[in-house]
Structure formats: structure tokens, C-alpha cells
């Protein structure tokens, strides 16, 4: 039997400033995993989170 897909899905959010910023504390790109509700949030998610590479709170956008 096939189970129904739930409404909540797991997504990955990535720092937008790590790609363009050259004055970073360390190399790399910050990524977090979180979940979102497909019915309530149909578009791409944007969250302000702490980036350890930029050493600041930056906007993290949802990636595929």
C-alpha cells in the first residue's frame, strides 16, 4: 500500500551572502534544514538566520 504524502516537507535553506561576499570569516556556504507546510507557504521560503561563515544574521533562501 502506498502511503499519502504529508503536507509538511523538509527543505534546505542557504545563505545568500556567502556566494557574493568576499570578506568572510571562513570559506564555505551556510545551509540549514527545516520543514515547511506546502499549503500555507507555496512559494520559496526566506528566513533570517545566523551564518557562521559571514559571522552575522543574513537572509537564507530555500534551494532545491
From Swiss-Prot:
Annotated PROSITE patterns: RIBOSOMAL_L33
Keywords assigned by UniProt, alphabetized: Ribonucleoprotein, Ribosomal protein
Pfam annotation, one family: Ribosomal_L33
InterPro entries: Ribosomal_bL33 (IPR001705), Ribosomal_bL33_CS (IPR018264), Ribosomal_bL33_sf (IPR038584), Ribosomal_zn-bd (IPR011332)
Coiled-coil zones: none
GO cellular component terms, semicolon-separated: cytoplasm; ribonucleoprotein complex; ribosome
Signal peptide: none
SUPFAM superfamilies referenced in this protein's UniProt entry, alphabetically: Zn-binding ribosomal proteins (SSF57829)
One BP annotation, GO: translation
One GO molecular-function entry: structural constituent of ribosome
Classification via HAMAP family: Ribosomal_bL33
PANTHER family attached to this UniProt entry: 50S RIBOSOMAL PROTEIN L33, CHLOROPLASTIC, LARGE RIBOSOMAL SUBUNIT PROTEIN BL33C
Family: Belongs to the bacterial ribosomal protein bL33 family.
Name this protein carries in UniProt: Large ribosomal subunit protein bL33
Species of origin: Picosynechococcus sp. (strain ATCC 27264 / PCC 7002 / PR-6)
Native organism taxonomy: Bacteria, Bacillati, Cyanobacteriota, Cyanophyceae, Oscillatoriophycideae
Amino acid at each position: 500500500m502506498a502511503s499519502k504524502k504529508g503536507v509538511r516537507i523538509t527543505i534546505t535553506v542557504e545563505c545568500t551572502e556567502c556566494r557574493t561576499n568576499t570578506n568572510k570569516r571562513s570559506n564555505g556556504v551556510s545551509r540549514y534544514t527545516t520543514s515547511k507546510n506546502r499549503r500555507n507557504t507555496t512559494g520559496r521560503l526566506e528566513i533570517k538566520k545566523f551564518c557562521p561563515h559571514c559571522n552575522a544574521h543574513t537572509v537564507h533562501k530555500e534551494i532545491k
